[in-house]
Design a protein with these regions (language model features):
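Amphipathic alpha-helical polymerization modules
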Residues: 1-181
Length: 181
């Protein structure tokens, strides 16, 4: 009886975990920049005397789907898409640098550029990008952010920090949904 309970328990835990991952993926299917989570499981036999018939379910691969979703034209000057595997650098809620593929940029009331969920967008030097009051902003294909105030010519106020992870230093999903090196 003992063997059956533990085998059933680990199988049920794996099924619940898999269902949670699938539900999260479905709930976020239309979220800008979302990366679907992956989870696979394998059977692991327990070693030891009298335990040869015990098998447990163990998560074998936890990761994320790293393919870009479809590009959608929004005709909004602050909507951008990182190309060629690049990620936008943002300041996470814990103050550390984190990465996202969400290119929906907004201007906060204090003038800083933020993501749709309020995280500050970082410039190539690692500092937040701040816009002058009342400026009309544009983002160039190379990530340069320009501000035009009134009839004055547009001036570059920063450049989006883009990070391309390598196989030697991959990004890992954090509990907050952001990625970190």
């Amino acid at each position: 009886m003992d063997r059956l309970i533990y085998t059933a328990m680990t199988g049920a835990n794996a099924a619940a975990s898999r269902q949670s991952v699938i539900a999260n993926n479905l709930a976020n299917v239309s979220t800008n920049g979302f990366r679907a989570q992956l989870a696979t499981y394998r059977a692991v036999p327990l070693r030891g005397e009298g335990a040869t018939t015990r098998v447990f379910a163990l998560e074998a691969t936890a990761g994320h789907l790293d393919t870009a979703g479809p590009a959608m034209r929004t005709d909004r000057s602050l909507d951008v898409m990182a190309k060629d595997g690049a990620w936008f650098a943002v300041q996470g809620l814990d103050g550390t640098e984190a990465y996202t593929r969400n290119g929906h940029v907004e201007v906060a009331t204090d003038g800083t550029l933020t993501t749709g969920n309020g995280l500050q967008v970082l410039s190539s030097d690692g500092s937040p990008i701040t816009s002058p009051a009342g400026a009309e902003l544009t983002i160039q294909p190379d990530g340069t952010v320009s501000a035009k105030v009134g009839n004055q010519p547009a001036n570059a106020i920063g450049r989006l920090k883009l990070v391309v992870p390598t196989p030697e230093d991959p990004l890992v999903r954090s509990g907050d949904g952001l990625f970190r090196a």
